[in-house]
Amino acid sequence: MSLLLFHLNASRTMNMEFFHRTLFVYDQQIIYKHRNLFRKFETTIPYTHVSKFFLTEGIIFSDVEIVAPGLKESIKLRYVTKRGARIAKFLIDEKTKAFGGKASAEDLENIDKIEKYIGRLYELKKNRKISQEELFIRREIFLKKIEKNNRLG
């Protein structure tokens, strides 16, 4: 089972859609889900296939675009939170470096620490030591520490 590191939702109201577009960042792959009134779309991208990740920041919202060579068109999420977009970019950049073999020892240690901590939180939730709300709170606190340490903000 893959470990969910982060998920990013696009704004439904700003995009004028019934359902929001979602990007799930797992430890092995990225999953993009989009739904229309009658159809559901889901795309799975391994980190080895991610060629570019574009982050465009506005005053309030950000736009995220992922380009992979095997896709018909690039994945675009418009009107996402700036903080969430920065964290997703950091995680995806670290994972693509790790899977591409271009990562330094410090980068690999950093991504291992993230995966171990979040994996431990999910394990505690599974054993009913912490609740779902506490899991989200602890994960957000940990991601804020990462954001502060890597100067993503």
Predicted regions span which residues?
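Short, compositionally biased strand/turn segments
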Residues: 16-38
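Short, charged, amphipathic alpha-helical segments
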Residues: 132-140
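Short Cys/His-rich micro-motifs in 6-15 aa windows
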Residues: 143
